[in-house]
Amino acid sequence: MINSFSLFAHITPIIRSSLHSRYSVISSRKAMSSLAAAPYRHVMMPFSPAQDAQVHGNSALTKLTDAIPDLKIYTRSSPHYESLRGVYNKLITAQPLAICRPTSVAQVQAIVKTVSGLGIPLGVRGGGHDVFGRGCIADSVTIDMRELDTQELSQDKKTVKVGGGITSKNLVGFLGSHNLCTSNGFAGEAGWTSWASWGGYGPLGDYVGLGVDNIVGAKIVTASGDVVDAKGDSELLWALRGGGGNFGVIAETDVRVYPMSTIQAGFIVYPWPETADVLLRLQALLDSGVPDKLCLQAGFTKGEWGLGMAITYIWPEAETIGPESEEWLQKLKGLGTCIVDTVAETTFEAFQASISSAISNPVNVTSRHISISKFTSDTLNQLIGACESMPAEADCSITCTILHGKAAQANVLSAFGTRRPHIMLHINAVTEEAAHEHVAIAWADRLVDGVEATGDSIGSTYVSFMESDKDPKGCYGENWERLKAVKKEVDPNDVFRFVHGRIPAA
């Protein structure tokens, strides 16, 4: 799952486009649609048992097809296999034994029951944007959730019930047709459920909370194949709000939604030599107090214009777009010499689409993250130095998600660990050739090491952006032992072990 990857690596064409259109799609807001979401669904994958489900004498697959005769299962000889297997990060080349596309929760139950008794790995895939490939496990039976992507808005339009395979852009599009939104990232192709349940850092977090804060209920298929409705103050619901798919397949979630007809959003770009001064002034502004509805990110990249730093600005409250939002926008522009300002009234759907279009195609990507308590001279020296040493073999970017509002507030109803103001640095390096991966790794790791050496780091805070071989205990903080107890109760045999921030059963 990937949230803001390469946002600023592709900012030049986005800025150029926005200067012409100013996100004018606001004038074409969809008419109010029904409470169900037929237009905002995945296209059903064609399936022919004769072509797609050849088991080639494999006893495990034979048992699976015998147990679930109507299951859409795609083995390695299927003409659709590679299109289903492929993920966002092209460096992930693992080949599952078979990929299943369930069309009902009952089929998910049957897959889990059957596979857990066969002694072979079980994988679960949402959108396929996890850059570490935890939805594409070698020799596994993989549950591909993408056809379980129903959406239904409640009658009072305060919550939406979504299937576990829903993507961010489809959720945003459906809610946008009702002038609503919820916490989301910028990568429209990312699976919303996994993004949200492991934390859900995103550009609206300070206004509406993290992804985990907006899950109000869930339907989970546990390792035994049973369906559990997690709601209220249940321990399982608390655990999956931060521990995600460690406890089972999240087949459905109930999600809190918010009125959001229009937003004010865009990029503010400053001259590269002013970078440190601008961000230190921004930190002083944050320290003095800013409203939750001022949502900010900062980003660094090298493009056709050379090195650049920009602030992403979003004001998501339509009722206060005007004098109040303009006051804060002018404060941001006054942090330095504003050389580009693309801020305009738009919709979150349009703004997400303008960014997501640049980060949808698969790439060879190396990704790291580290969080800091605030911008300091030492951390900025490391960030600026890393930018000035970006290797020629890689397209590098750093996105800084700034948490100061609701996203940073304590929430005892979730297991997400880091509840304090901080800045999460998402570090990415894309290489045209896979053979240059070592160059990307060296650059990204050097930056992480440099930030840690300043003493300003608070370590890793987001398991979705953490390498699989790293210990996630620090991300969960004081919730670690409680999470282990839940894991031991619902998945004692560690069936769901190929996940973000793995929580051991023992």
UniProtKB/Swiss-Prot annotation:
Compartmental location: Secreted; Secreted, Extracellular space
Needed cofactors: FAD
Induction: Expression is regulated by the aurofusarin biosynthesis cluster-specific transcription factor aurR1/GIP2.
GO terms of molecular function: FAD binding; oxidoreductase activity
The keyword Ribonucleoprotein appears for this protein: no
Gene3D superfamilies, per the entry: 3.30.465.10, 3.40.462.20, Uridine Diphospho-n-acetylenolpyruvylglucosamine Reductase, domain 2
Coiled-coil intervals, chain numbering: none
Keyword Endoplasmic reticulum: no
Enzyme class: oxidoreductase
Key words of the record: FAD, Flavoprotein, Oxidoreductase, Secreted
Traits of the deletion mutant: Impairs the production of aurofusarin and leads to the accumulation of a light yellow pigment.
Domain FAD-binding PCMH-type: start-end pairs: 92-260
Pathway named in the protein's UniProt entry: Pigment biosynthesis
Disulfide bonds: none
First-listed, main subcellular location of the protein, grouped into a coarse class: secreted
Role this protein plays: FAD-linked oxidoreductase; part of the gene cluster that mediates the biosynthesis of aurofusarin, a red mycelium pigment which is acting as a mycotoxin. The first step is performed by the polyketide synthase which condenses one acetyl-CoA and 6 malonyl-CoA units to form the first intermediate, the cyclic heptaketide and yellow pigment YWA1. The C2 hydroxyl group in the pyrone ring of YWA1 is probably formed during ring closure by an aldol-type cyclization reaction.
Subunit relationships: Might be part of an extracellular enzyme complex composed of GIP1, aurF, aurO and aurS.
Family affiliation: Belongs to the oxygen-dependent FAD-linked oxidoreductase family.
Protein name: FAD-linked oxidoreductase aurO
Organism for this UniProt entry: Gibberella zeae (strain ATCC MYA-4620 / CBS 123657 / FGSC 9075 / NRRL 31084 / PH-1) (Wheat head blight fungus)
Gene: aurO
